[in-house]
Amino acid sequence: MIKSWWAEKSTSEKQIVAALAVLSLGVFCWLGVIKPIDTYIAEHQSHAQKIKKDIKWMQDQASTHGLLGHPALTQPIKNILLEEAKRENLAITLENGPDNTLTIHPVTAPLENVSRWLTTAQVTYGIVIEDLQFTLAGNEEITLRHLSFREQQ
C-alpha cells in the first residue's frame, strides 16, 4: 500500500516529501531532545551557582562569628599588619616581642581607622589581639600605648 502510493508520486513530490521528513526529524530532535537538555543544564548550573553563593555566605558568617578557623597565613603576620595599616593610613612601627608576639610603638591615629584595622586583622586573618592599651588623644583620636598581636593557634 505505501509502496504503491510512493510509486505513484512524481520525482518532485518525492523530493518534497523527503525534505519534509528530514525537516520534521530536525524539528523533533531540536524541540524534543536538544532544547530540553539545554534547559536542564542551564537550570542545574544556575542551581549550582546559587549553592556556591550560599556556601560562601555561610562560610563568611561562620568565620565572622568565630565558628570556623581562618586559613593559614600566606605571609608573615608583621607584613599583613603593616600592609593593612597602610590601607588605613596608619603610620605604625611593629617590633617582635616575646613568645612570637608583635608589639606596636605608641602612635596617635583616628579611632575609626584603628578600629577598621583591628577588625580586619581579627576577622579576615584571624590575628589575635593579646593586649590593647590606649588613651584619648583629642577629637575622635586615640593614642595606642601598647598593642600586642599573635597568630591564631
Swiss-Prot record:
One of its GO terms (cellular component) is plasma membrane. Keywords: Cell inner membrane, Cell membrane, Membrane, Protein transport, Transmembrane, Transmembrane helix, Transport. Residues 38-153 are periplasmic. It is found in: Cell inner membrane. The chain crosses the membrane at residues 17-37. Its main location: membrane. Type II secretion system is composed of four main components: the outer membrane complex, the inner membrane complex, the cytoplasmic secretion ATPase and the periplasm-spanning pseudopilus. Forms homodimers. Interacts with GspL. Interacts with GspE and GspF. Part of a cryptic operon that encodes proteins involved in type II secretion machinery in other organisms, but is not expressed in strain K12. Belongs to the GSP M family. This is Putative type II secretion system protein M. The gene is gspM.
